[in-house]
Amino acid sequence: MMEKSLNTVTSLPLRVIYCIDRASAIRCLAKSQHAVPIQVLKEVEPKKVICQVDIQHVIQTVCRCSPELSCKSQGDFSVYFLDHTEPDELFVGLGYWSSLLLSPTLNAGTSNSDTVWVNGFIVEFGIQRSIEIKLRFQSLQNSFEVGTPETHTSSKFLSSTLPPSLIFDPSSSEKSDSISGSLFDTNYTCPVNINGLSKQKSVRELKSPSRPSALAETNVEELELDSLFHASNDISCSATSFSEPYILDHQAALDHPATDPVCSASSTTVNSAVSTKKRRRESSTISPESAYVAAQLQNPSEREQVHEFIKEQVRIARGRIEKKFTNVRGKNRIEEQLTLSLQEGKIPPYCQNCGTIKTANWRNATYMNITLMLCNACGIYWTSRRSMRPRNLWSTYKAFETEKPLENDAFAQLELAVYKLSQQRKLSISIFRELENAGRHSPLNRLTSLDSTHSAPDPNHISKPSVVNQQKSRGGPRTAKLKNDLRRIQSSPIVAPTPDTSFREPLSEIGSNDSWLVLPNSLSANIQNDVLRKTDFMCTDKENVAFPLKTTTKPMPKVNKEETEPTLPVCDSEKENDDLECYFRTPPKPTTLQKQQQSPSPWRSELFLSDPDQNVLTPRHKPKFDLSKALSSVAKSNNIENSPQLPERYDFSLELGLNSQLDNEERRDIPLMTDLVMPSSPPMVPADRHLSVENTC
């Protein structure tokens, strides 16, 4: 940056930008009527020149444009100006505003050593150039006049230039001291003024913290502003530099015992008045803030405004305590929050995803130990889908990217600025970068496509999502397909993963949001061979397993359509066959009949639950038995003995297929009655064996 010093003097109009109090966001502008002499210090840039001007021109411009600053009822201020010659452009203090008003620099003929200089930049507005000075006024709650030699010597010069109302009269302070001294003779203790309140009263309030709030208990009808002003003015013993000392009680000062002809009654009158005022101050429930504000106001119109303000605050406080006022909701609450944020000078809360500032509720989303503040729509979308709401669903994107808001709409302009800020800050937040890499800024259909890229290339795997998408586009029911897929998952055997097997896909491929449930891909030929080589007790659905038929077995005898009832399995002890798989198969039913869906039963899938070491053989050919010849008339009359249930005495029950007393040829010739064996009942012991055993006993 190039700097160039210029020691030239010129004249330019003056612009003074100032604000009152640090918390105030209102800036004021004061312009001079004529050009004032300035001195050029240096040129920082080609169009940025720093100049300095005498403080007297600044004071005259501010007093002419803002006369309330020179009013004695406003109190005193501390003044600061922005020094552009400092490296960080700091605010430099100039002291009391009253001292600047009383300074001799307001008059001609002063030396250059006593001149106070302030600096600023030269600004251009069109074809007019002017020097711009920035000031800040900080109000002082208690400003005591400090006697200095400059103050007394400058009063003579001030009387010729300022009106009499702005000139401080030191005799008023002496008069107030004499009056307060005369009152001390009557044993009256005047409390020290602290922030416009009694020190004794503040001490009493600190000693009793259990005292309820004044706003909640104050009766509006009993608040008399005149009594407030008398009570506050009675206890003020000091005066500011621009206000005359307020006498404690004019009537009490006139009725002093030394000047009153009736001296005996005057002392008792003063004492009674003092005690009455003490009791009034003790019994008063006025808040310190209300008393201070009332003490500072002397205009009747301002008193009425304060009175109405106190009434409104008391009414609101009582209404909130009694829960009569409902919470502000909807659009009014949103605008109230935005207005409050603007008054505080802060950025309103906004959604870190879509950047909106108008929402019914705010929600927090936690991901990777990072908490994000989201609007109601983005928060619900994140909770339900664990992904950020896409841009095409944002109301801000539709409002600001496609069309521009109106220039006269303040809230729309604010929302546009916050939206741009949020999109800029998203680039610096790590959680959005991680979600973007994981594909979590889009709906779940994109997430499934990312998962499918990790699986091995399989033609079945590629065709499956297309079929699901076609069904989804047609809008047809997918309930049957979902049930079949879920049944296949539950019935499929557990196989250890191998490098040849493919990864499983999420359930979103079939249109479900349950991501914990996965679907198997099409099995390879190696896995199918492994399943076929498993033993029988590892398979849960043996009816649907298609085992190859052996050519060495006997052909299936022809049966009629009416004789399709279940058969009792028997074994052929004379036949020696090492192939055990043929004995664990259920004979296929005739193809002419339509297979009916039957309820699952453990007796149908596993006839015998035995140890692996024990050989229980079941022949493929199951002839029928007819026990009608073996049952006698006496046995038929006894229903308990001839019931199809097993006998109560299990000691005499013989194992099926291991009894050598019955001839194999006789078993094949005797048909079995359908009334004794149910489709889902366990295998029964032949009744002829049972009867023969009982007869022997």
UniProtKB/Swiss-Prot annotation:
Protein name as catalogued: CENP-A multicopy suppressor protein 2
Zinc finger residue ranges, GATA-type: 351-378
Keyword annotations from UniProtKB, A to Z: Centromere, Chromosome, DNA-binding, Metal-binding, Nucleus, Transcription, Transcription regulation, Zinc, Zinc-finger
Positions of the UniProt region annotated as Disordered: 443-484
One example of a Gene Ontology biological process annotation: CENP-A containing chromatin assembly
Composition-biased stretches (Polar residues): 445-455
Keyword field contains Transcription: yes
Function, as annotated: Required for proper chromosome segregation via regulation of CENP-A localization to the centromere.
One Gene Ontology molecular-function label: zinc ion binding
Gene: ams2
Cellular location(s): Nucleus; Chromosome, Centromere
Organism: Schizosaccharomyces pombe (strain 972 / ATCC 24843)
GO cellular component: chromatin; chromosome, centromeric core domain; nucleus
Subunit: Interacts with CENP-A.
Pfam name, any one: GATA
